């Protein structure tokens, strides 16, 4: 993912026309959309990995999954972002290891890990909500524990997860605004630059508000499409 710099006119070219804001805000919005999609993808991977891990019979896997979930649910996303970007390199220098992360990597990593911690609880809850009779039927068919999970529990649990994952997707979109604090040129960063230059807070932040709302509407629409597809897929399996 590449971020773009926001180019502003010279002060002699100062203009209060809202059309002048569209270019910088549009480029910032594209960065925001990319961060949202990346964090959703990697967050979903973490959700299933650690949600299933929390149900594991292996004490190490279960313990590590619980530790991850509690740490990232119990601490601020902003602090997690700052720790990865500012504190981790210092800790690495103390150990003689280069642990410096680019703003893009630090941003995606923090958003994904935080999203995954909340998603893991959704996955765990949906799997545990599957009727015990389904597991009994799987046992009667001589399924192993992993076969029962992948062939019986998950196909029934995934449709139940989708509404909650849709909410997490919207939360991920809004959380991307924090990456502006580590110098990433997202929509919020572009808005702050425009506000500082033009001193036109009302117009700039009204446009940003509408752009976030528009992105959220599109994201909600696609999440509903995915939810409908998953529901139809489940119906075909019956």
Curated annotation (Swiss-Prot):
It comes from Sinorhizobium fredii (strain NBRC 101917 / NGR234). Residues 29-223 form the ABC transmembrane type-1 domain. It is found in: Cell inner membrane. The chain crosses the membrane at residues 33-53, 77-97, 103-123, 152-172, 203-223. Probably part of the binding-protein-dependent transport system y4tEFGH for an amino acid. Probably responsible for the translocation of the substrate across the membrane. The keyword Transmembrane helix applies. The lineage of its organism: Bacteria, Pseudomonadati, Pseudomonadota, Alphaproteobacteria, Hyphomicrobiales. Keywords: Amino-acid transport, Cell inner membrane, Cell membrane, Membrane, Plasmid, Transmembrane, Transmembrane helix, Transport. Belongs to the binding-protein-dependent transport system permease family. HisMQ subfamily. Disulfide bonds: none annotated. GO terms for cellular component: ATP-binding cassette (ABC) transporter complex. CDD domains: TM_PBP2. GO terms for biological process: amino acid transport. One of its GO terms (molecular function) is transmembrane transporter activity. It is a multi-pass membrane protein. InterPro entries: AA_ABC_transptr_permease_3TM, ArtM/GltK/GlnP/TcyL/YhdX-like, Ectoine_EhuC, MetI-like, MetI-like_sf. This is Probable amino-acid ABC transporter permease protein y4tF. Pfam families: BPD_transp_1 (PF00528).
């Amino acid at each position: 993912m590449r971020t773009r710099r926001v180019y502003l006119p010279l002060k002699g070219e100062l203009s209060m026309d809202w059309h002048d804001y569209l270019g910088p805000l549009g480029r910032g919005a594209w960065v925001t959309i990319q961060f949202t999609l990346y964090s959703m993808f990697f967050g979903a991977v973490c959700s299933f990995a650690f949600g299933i891990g929390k149900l594991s019979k292996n004490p190490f896997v279960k313990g590590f999954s619980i530790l991850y979930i509690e740490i990232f649910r119990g601490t601020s996303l902003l602090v997690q972002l700052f720790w990865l970007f500012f504190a981790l390199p210092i800790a690495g220098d103390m150990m003689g290891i280069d642990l410096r992360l680019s703003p893009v990597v630090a941003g995606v990593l923090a958003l994904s890990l935080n999203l995954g911690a909340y998603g893991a609880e959704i996955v765990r809850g949906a799997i545990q909500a599957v009727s015990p009779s389904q597991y009994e039927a799987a046992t009667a068919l001589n399924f192993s524990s992993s076969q029962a999970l992948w062939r019986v529990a998950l196909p029934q649990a995934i449709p139940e997860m989708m509404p909650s994952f849709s909410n997490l997707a919207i939360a991920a979109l809004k959380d991307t605004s924090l990456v502006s604090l580590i110098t990433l040129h997202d929509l919020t960063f572009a808005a702050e630059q425009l506000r500082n230059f033009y001193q036109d807070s009302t117009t700039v932040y009204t446009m940003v508000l509408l752009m976030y709302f528009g992105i959220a509407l599109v994201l909600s629409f696609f999440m509903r499409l995915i939810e409908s597809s998953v529901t139809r897929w489940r119906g075909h399996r019956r």
